[in-house]
């Protein structure tokens, strides 16, 4: 009997969620044990700023970005095929959703490459791209899910996706605003520090959005189970 999370192409969102979650948790555990960040809700990027955890963070987030892009492209192809049998979606809508999602993956690559304290402006720009494009992507995918219901999705799945999307959307605003209000960047936050309440609120929202993405991709597993991925290789005779 095959594992339900490995049937068809379901391994893609499954590995994405497992790998991304492990990347966050591994860098958090290492940074806390070494004493680089306080254990109570640091920023995700703070846990991957100092070596050796910075290497773990950068590598795992880079792989997550590639897995995310592969998952989004496969999702795009699935929707394209589904739309052939029942015309429930304009073609451009699926393309726009994919473009936004891939742009978010590029943002993840920027976050992984440019560390928070080394190049803060570039790192912050990458993080902003990741979170904003990520939220836009899952909101669009939730809308698409409702359009394809009940043929390709259950009503319950649509509701779950939209709920996760709205929570992420609500959280991304205070995450950005309170990050600015918290003041200068630092790793050793203490409750007595000026701006700490803003920092704490922003960090909680950041973790909420990040794991909201993971929860959302979990809902793709059922859709991917009935799909197979094939690589076709052709050798041109005139080469």
Curated annotation (Swiss-Prot):
It is a multi-pass membrane protein. One of its GO terms (biological process) is regulation of autophagy. Pfam families: Frag1. Keywords: Apoptosis, Autophagy, Lysosome, Membrane, Transmembrane, Transmembrane helix. GO terms for cellular component: lysosomal membrane; lysosome. It is found in: Lysosome membrane. InterPro entries: DRAM/TMEM150_Autophagy_Mod, Frag1/DRAM/Sfk1. The chain crosses the membrane at residues 15-35, 54-74, 91-111, 119-139, 162-182, 201-221. Belongs to the DRAM/TMEM150 family. Lysosomal modulator of autophagy that plays a central role in p53/TP53-mediated apoptosis. This is DNA damage-regulated autophagy modulator protein 1. It comes from Xenopus laevis (African clawed frog).
């Amino acid at each position: 009997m095959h594992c339900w999370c490995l049937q068809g192409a379901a391994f893609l969102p499954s590995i994405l969620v497992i790998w991304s979650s492990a990347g966050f948790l591994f860098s958090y555990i290492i940074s806390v044990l070494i004493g680089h960040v306080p254990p109570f809700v640091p920023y995700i990027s703070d846990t991957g700023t100092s070596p050796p955890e910075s290497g773990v963070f950068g590598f795992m987030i880079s792989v997550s970005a590639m897995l995310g892009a592969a998952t989004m492209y496969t999702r795009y192809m699935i929707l394209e095929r589904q739309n052939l049998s029942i015309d429930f979606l304009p073609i451009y809508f699926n393309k726009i959703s994919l473009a936004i999602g891939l742009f978010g993956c590029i943002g993840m690559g920027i976050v992984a490459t440019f560390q928070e304290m080394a190049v803060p402006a570039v790192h912050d720009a990458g993080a902003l791209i990741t979170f904003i494009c990520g939220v836009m992507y899952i909101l669009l995918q939730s809308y698409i899910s409702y359009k394809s219901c009940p043929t390709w999705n259950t009503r319950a799945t649509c509701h779950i996706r939209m709920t996760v999307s709205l929570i992420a959307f609500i959280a991304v605003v205070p995450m950005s605003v309170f990050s600015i209000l918290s003041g200068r960047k630092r790793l050793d936050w203490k409750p007595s520090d000026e701006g700490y309440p803003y920092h704490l609120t922003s960090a909680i929202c950041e973790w909420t959005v990040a794991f909201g993405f993971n929860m959302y991709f979990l809902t793709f597993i059922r859709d991917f189970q009935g799909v197979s991925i094939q690589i076709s290789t052709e050798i041109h005779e005139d080469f």
